[in-house]
Curated annotation (Swiss-Prot):
Organism, as annotated: Burkholderia pseudomallei (strain K96243)
Function: Transfers the gamma-phosphate of ATP to the 4'-position of a tetraacyldisaccharide 1-phosphate intermediate (termed DS-1-P) to form tetraacyldisaccharide 1,4'-bis-phosphate (lipid IVA).
Gene designation per UniProt: lpxK
PANTHER family: TETRAACYLDISACCHARIDE 4'-KINASE (PTHR42724), TETRAACYLDISACCHARIDE 4'-KINASE, MITOCHONDRIAL-RELATED (PTHR42724:SF1)
NCBIfam families: lpxK
UniProt pathway: Glycolipid biosynthesis; lipid IV(A) biosynthesis; lipid IV(A) from (3R)-3-hydroxytetradecanoyl-[acyl-carrier-protein] and UDP-N-acetyl-alpha-D-glucosamine: step 6/6
Protein name as it appears in the record: Tetraacyldisaccharide 4'-kinase
GO cellular component: plasma membrane
Transmembrane segments: none
Keywords: ATP-binding, Kinase, Lipid A biosynthesis, Lipid biosynthesis, Lipid metabolism, Nucleotide-binding, Transferase
Family to which the UniProt record says this protein belongs: Belongs to the LpxK family.
GO terms of molecular function: ATP binding; tetraacyldisaccharide 4'-kinase activity
GO biological process, one term: lipid A biosynthetic process
InterPro entries found in the cross-reference section: LpxK, P-loop_NTPase
Length: 342
């Protein structure tokens, strides 16, 4: 197996660690962070003051995003929010950039779409929610295309896109993991795309260690719980995680925060060897072919990229369910029914 995935993952992990402290590297990059912050502030001000126009697509938009780099749990949050909005009487659709997708124009994503065209996260959302999902780097174009194809949709959830200021939105939800804002510096000295003080309607904190929530207004805990694993070759075959406890298990993840996946497995009683792959890892070849384990546990996001040509009977997929605080759902529904613009 090529060493490149391991090198990339280690480089990502090293940078992530540096972003959690104000060490020599962070201070060396601080001048660049100041320049980045000035440019970002100017962009925000241009839309806030009307120098540039926001586009109202004729349907309320709920943006689920983050102000930090890396995975925080946005995708399971989007899936849970779509289900909650549907239960509240809405007909939701979803738009996404489609990271890694080879598209230039708005494109519909279905459960049968190839991951190269759809992107891994939109494809997972389409399969889990069965809601209309459209992808495009231009989210305004994606919302317009979705609404034209599905006039029954009365709310659109944007998977990421917090910094896509051109798109008018009714609600903004910012998702953090346990690292919150790291060292508090903007890119490239820290993990922040925008200051922690950035205005939003609600904050979710995905902290597997269940520490106290930060004292921010309208802040809620985000709980992610694993379900029974399902077999990659035979999805109808299920296995509780506890049954892997006595086996030689490898846990592998090509997501933004792989350690969170590993911690989830440990909390369920599994003691796996671990392998962090680069985020959005393509799985062009089987990276496990030379590994000697009884079982290999991967995430749902990675599983959507493994086609029918994969024939590795050791691979099991671990789904994750997000539990949203009822108060958050009530806040979102109230804002949508009031059609308040953020």
């Amino acid at each position: 197996m090529s060493a490149r995935p391991g090198l990339l993952a280690r480089a990502e992990a090293r940078l992530t660690r540096e972003w959690q402290r104000r060490g020599a590297l962070a201070w060396a990059l601080a001048p660049f962070a100041c320049a980045f912050g000035a440019i970002a502030a100017l962009r925000r001000a241009a839309y806030a003051r009307g120098w540039k126009a926001r586009v109202d697509c004729g349907v309320p938009v709920v943006v689920v995003g983050n102000v930090t780099v890396g995975g925080t749990g946005k995708t399971p949050t989007v899936i849970a929010l779509v289900d909650a909005l549907r239960a509240a009487g809405f007909t939701p659709g979803v738009v996404s950039r489609g990271y890694g997708a080879k598209i230039a124009a708005p494109t519909a994503v279905t459960a049968a779409s190839p991951p190269q065209q759809a992107g891994d996260e939109p494809l997972l959302i389409a399969r889990r929610t069965l809601a209309p999902v459209w992808v495009c780097p231009d989210r305004v174009a994606a919302v317009r295309a979705l609404k034209a194809a599905h006039p029954e949709v009365d709310v659109v959830v944007s998977d990421d896109g917090l910094q896509h200021y051109r798109l008018a939105r009714a609600v903004e939800i910012v998702v953090f993991d346990h690292r919150l804002g790291g060292n508090g510096f903007l890119l490239p000295a820290g993990p922040l795309r925008e200051p922690l003080s950035r205005r939003r309607d609600a904050t979710l904190v995905n902290d597997p260690y269940s520490r106290a929530l930060p004292p921010w207004p309208d802040t809620f805990a985000l709980s992610l719980a694993p379900g029974d694993a399902w077999h990659l070759d035979r999805p109808s075959r299920r296995k509780p995680l506890a049954q892997f406890a006595g086996e030689r298990v490898l846990a592998a993840a090509g997501i933004g925060a792989p350690e969170r996946f590993f911690a989830t497995l440990r909390a369920a009683g599994v003691a796996p060897a671990t392998r962090a792959l680069p985020d959005h890892y393509a799985f062009a070849t089987n990276p496990f072919v030379d590994d000697h384990f009884d079982a290999i546990l991967i995430t749902e996001k990675d599983a959507v990229k493994l086609g029918t040509s994969w024939r590795d009977a050791r691979i099991w997929v671990v789904p994750v369910e997000a539990a949203l605080d009822p108060r958050l759902i009530a806040l979102v529904v109230e804002k949508l029914r009031g059609r308040t613009s953020a």
